[in-house]
């Protein structure tokens, strides 16, 4: 085997390794995939993401307990804003969701999502 062939083989192996490790953790779904037994689906999604975002804010030195001093009206406005954000993000990503099969439903309902994946949906 020549040196250039050996180099090409090693480069190809490294490229495959990088691609696999970069994209190996992504969830891919199809519409007919069953929901994960521990998945978060339906109205629970917005509640869980809201809680996770508040936890993230507290971890980063934000409000110590954001839920403690948000009134009912404020909480409703936050929820509406969050749902609006999800809708906008869903519309923006609609084409890529159809192509790649990824998104909050795929990550958290069809699969069991992690705290880090939930945090990606905070604004």
Swiss-Prot record:
Molecular functions per Gene Ontology: hormone activity; toxin activity
Alphabetical keyword list: Carbohydrate metabolism, Cleavage on pair of basic residues, Disulfide bond, Gamma-carboxyglutamic acid, Glucose metabolism, Hormone, Hydroxylation, Secreted, Signal, Toxin
Tree of life domain: Eukaryota
Pfam families named in the record: Insulin
Disulfide bonds: 29-106, 41-109, 53-122, 108-113
Positions carrying 4-hydroxyproline: 34
InterPro entries referenced in this protein's UniProt entry, alphabetically: Insulin-like (IPR016179), Insulin-like_sf (IPR036438), Insulin-rel_pep (IPR016724), Insulin_CS (IPR022353)
Propeptide: 59-102
Subcellular localization, as worded in the UniProt entry: Secreted
Free-text tissue specificity from the UniProt record: Expressed by the venom duct.
Residues making up the signal peptide according to the UniProt record: 1-24
PTM annotation (4-carboxyglutamate): residues: 107, 117
A Gene Ontology term for the protein's cellular component: extracellular region
SUPFAM superfamilies per UniProt: Insulin-like
GO biological process: glucose metabolic process
Function: This venom insulin facilitates prey capture by rapidly inducing hypoglycemic shock. Intraperitoneal injection of this peptide into zebrafish lowers blood glucose with the same potency than human insulin. In vivo, when applied to water, this peptide reduces overall locomotor activity of zebrafish larvae, observed as a significant decrease in the percentage of time spent swimming and movement frequency.
Quaternary structure and partners: Heterodimer of A and B chains; disulfide-linked.
Annotated family: Belongs to the insulin family.
Protein known as: Insulin-like peptide-1
């Amino acid at each position: 085997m020549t040196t250039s062939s050996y180099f090409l083989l090693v480069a190809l192996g490294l490229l495959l390794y990088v691609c696999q490790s970069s994209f190996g953790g992504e969830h891919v779904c199809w519409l007919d995939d069953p929901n994960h037994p521990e998945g978060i689906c339906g109205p629970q999604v917005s509640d869980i993401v809201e809680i996770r975002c508040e936890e993230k804010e507290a971890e980063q030195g934000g409000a110590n307990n954001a839920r403690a001093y948000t009134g009912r009206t404020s909480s409703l406005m936050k929820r509406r804003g969050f749902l609006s954000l999800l809708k906008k993000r869903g519309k923006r990503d609609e084409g890529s969701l159809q192509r790649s099969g990824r998104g909050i439903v795929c990550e958290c309902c069809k699969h069991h999502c992690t705290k880090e994946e939930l945090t990606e949906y905070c604004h």
